[in-house]
Amino acid sequence: MKFPWKVFKTTLLLLLLSHSLASVPSEDQPGDSYSHGQSCLGCVVLVSVIEQLAEVHNSSVQVAMERLCSYLPEKLFLKTACYFLVQTFGSDIIKLLDEAMKADVVCYALEFCKRGAVQPQCHLYPLPQEAWESALEKARQVLRRSSTMKYPRSGRNICSLPFLTKICQKIELSIKKAVPFKDIDSDKHSVFPTLRGYHWRGRDCNDSDKTVYPGRRPDNWDIHQDSNCNGIWGIDPKDGIPYEKKFCEGSQPRGIILLGDSAGAHFHIPPEWLTASQMSVNSFLNLPSALTDELNWPQLSGVTGFLDSTSGIEEKSIYHRLRKRNHCNHRDYQSISKNGASSRNLKNFIESLSRNQASDHPAIVLYAMIGNDVCNSKADTVPEMTTPEQMYANVMQTLTHLNSHLPNGSHVILYGLPDGTFLWDSLHNRYHPLGQLNKDVTYAQFFSFLRCLQLNPCNGWMSSNKTLRTLTSERAEQLSNTLKKIATTETFANFDLFYVDFAFHEIIEDWQKRGGQPWQLIEPVDGFHPNEVASLLQANRVWEKIQLQWPHVLGKENPFNSQIEEVFGDQGGH
């Protein structure tokens, strides 16, 4: 759930493919060792994919590298950059793989992986039959005989390449500010999908007028223009009544806002990006969009998703159901979520929330920092976890901010933290996508490799140490109890406050009743995040709980929905 900007500054493709794995917040990083860890991880992932492509297609390593580059889109110079890497490093990679060396040995020889004074030798694959040092020395001898070692051995930064500098700057700006990069009128809504555009918050319908944006109350009943971008405007010629007044007045419109981490934003790396037997041109069609959304897919998330699910299940996002309940809520969604977000650092980007107390509709706010307060990459992980006292102070600061920005009549729902022991229990003896071809990399090995590189996103739960996993769950329960206490004892002028458990065990039980297995609810590449199915099942449980216990939170069901569809169709889409 933690993926900082630095991840875009190592060796291109690998980071495109392994961005999820280098998942610790930048504010906590030990500098060079973290950067070296990213470079190592990216190199091992990329060399593994090249090696497996050669094996699957019974081709040479050279052909495998060219095949991989041919799969990539031209957008964002991805294909160009791939061929640049092949030209720079390809000859040496060929020589090393031709010597039957595994990807981790190759990357140590190429010095993408480094062993420091306190950094152990990290390996993903089973150790070679010969001693590790002997294998590494053999690899170095191969490179000494190479005539192509013309590239620098340190300070690699793909963003220094002239044709990638602007792309990197755009992504960096998007991540740091958490507001749309393309937003002419600076109203925090955009007509562009990615780079924090309408994949994250309702699409603007007039990007040259900052008084026009989703979620606002209509201006003069939107007689002349659609000021709130819900697709309802103008006057009914039959009776002279404005459509907004006829269809929406008294229907209690409201928006949905998520304050979340990468789980809420639906962080997702398609496994076919790493699985040689499944790779094709079609596998990477969404790569440019995913990269400019920080490898998140909020348009498919459980809270703010507006596209139909790709998973095939019937459950819908909370926004989707809120819009179905009242079509006047069209486009009123915001995903104020960020990779690495926690109660500690939400204050750094909560200003990106777009809500005006004087001119906007109320909102339902879901506070869902479900992991990073107990998850970190530190070797001594427990002291780095948020304490109940810190959680109380952090959340109260957030709620105070919301009280000064949300319109009266809003609602805030605090999500508890899950018990993440299911991660290890469900995955540790299964094969990671990189290990499925040759049955040589389990999730236990993968987690250990990340931990060695100081990149494990959750040393507490993604650990073979059962005692540590238990301690992490105990702290998560303490923090959930703190949230529950806040919800039951604190009051605010502009919103009421509720608490819901993030009961992942109930989601697992639900899924098993449908014939599924727990591991099918976890993102396969990072082995950490809930996947699309899990997010939608959780959204369904939250919706049902609200509907049963606090139905006023959802507002009325609009009796004019069918008439809105008849007059305005899909209301301009999303």
From Swiss-Prot:
Post-translation: what modifications? Cleaved into a large and a small subunit.
| Domain (Saposin B-type): residue spans on this chain | 36-117
Can you give the propeptide residue ranges? 23-33
Instruction: Enumerate the residues binding Ca(2+) 2.
Output: D185, D187, D204, N206, D209, V212
Which residue ranges does the record annotate as region Important for enzyme activity, localization to cytoplasmic vesicles, and protein stability? 37-69
Q: How is the cofactor bound, in the record's words?
A: Binds 3 Ca(2+) ions per subunit. The calcium ions probably have a structural role.
**E.C. numbers:** 3.1.1.77
GO-annotated molecular function: acyloxyacyl hydrolase activity; calcium ion binding
PANTHER family per the record?
A: ACYLOXYACYL HYDROLASE
Its annotated compartments are:
Secreted; Cytoplasmic vesicle
Task: Kindly state which keywords UniProt assigns to this record, in alphabetical order.
Answer: Calcium, Cytoplasmic vesicle, Disulfide bond, Glycoprotein, Hydrolase, Lipid metabolism, Metal-binding, Secreted, Signal, Zymogen
Where expressed (tissues)? Detected in peritoneal macrophages (at protein level). Strongly expressed in kidney cortex, where it may be produced by proximal tubule cells. In liver, expressed at high levels in Kupffer cells. Expressed by dendritic cells. Detected at low levels in alveolar macrophages.
Protein's name according to its UniProt entry: Acyloxyacyl hydrolase
Where does the UniProt entry place glycosylation sites? N58, N206, N408, N465
Catalytic activity, as annotated: a 3-(acyloxy)acyl derivative of bacterial toxin + H2O = a 3-hydroxyacyl derivative of bacterial toxin + a fatty acid + H(+)
**Gene deletion effect:** Animals develop significant and prolonged hepatosplenomegaly in response to bacterial lipopolysaccharide (LPS) challenge. Both liver and spleen show increased accumulation of leukocytes. Significantly reduced deacylation of LPS in liver and spleen, in peritoneal macrophages, and in bone marrow-derived dendritic cells. Increased lung injury, delayed neutrophil clearance, and prolonged recovery time in response to intranasal LPS administration. Alveolar macrophages show persistent activation and cytokine levels in lung remain elevated 4-7 days after LPS administration.
Q: What organism is listed for this UniProt entry?
A: Mus musculus
- Gene Ontology biological process terms in this record: fatty acid metabolic process; lipopolysaccharide catabolic process; lipopolysaccharide metabolic process; negative regulation of inflammatory response
Oligomeric and partner information: Heterodimer of the large and small subunits; disulfide-linked.
Cofactor dependency: Ca(2+)
Binding residues for Ca(2+) 3: D222, D226, N228, N230, I232, E244
Which residue pairs form cystines in this protein? Answer: C40-C113, C43-C107, C69-C82, C122-C452, C122-C452, C159-C168, C205-C229, C248-C328, C375-C458
Q: Which residues bind Ca(2+) 1?
A: D183, D185, D187, H189, D204, D207
InterPro entries cross-referenced by the UniProt entry: AOAH (IPR039676), AOAH_Saposin_N (IPR048593), GDSL (IPR001087), Saposin-like (IPR011001), SaposinB_dom (IPR008139), SGNH_hydro_sf (IPR036514)
